[in-house]
């Protein structure tokens, strides 16, 4: 219930968030794709989170790298692109297809893939922007390690239904953080 309430609070941010003030031109449909992806993740839920309490785990979301106030615009887009790529990797794995409704999973992956294409195009527009390579690499590494922990967790739990439910909720949180970061960067400009 708490996650549903949090989701409903994020929807207005998604609806009004301008996408063209980040130093690149994200299409106007990008925020709609974010909204649809988050909605699909909610619909994908197969188990009550209460039934999986024993399986919960803190994956150590790198909030200081993805959601921190000090993250720079030029650094944000590559980091968000990496985060989106990692989400796609998890949900397009062979083990993922057995865990979810095929129609919802395909729709979710299509939305995430389109977001990734938007972000990659944005990264290409920023090629001339110089950001401290060490800072950016540190953030990218933090995102990769975070998703590695999620992948290891799924393997250790043998891709159980509860493990997938925990991961679904965690990915919802990660995508919500990315939405909030983009909204914050848009407001700063």
UniProtKB/Swiss-Prot annotation:
Subcellular location, principal: secreted
Sites where a glycan is attached: 101
One GO biological process term: defense response to virus
SS bond list: 24-122, 52-162
Subcellular localization: Secreted
Protein task: Produced by macrophages, IFN-alpha have antiviral activities. Interferon stimulates the production of two enzymes: a protein kinase and an oligoadenylate synthetase.
Protein name (record): Interferon alpha-5
Organism of this sequence: Mus musculus (Mouse)
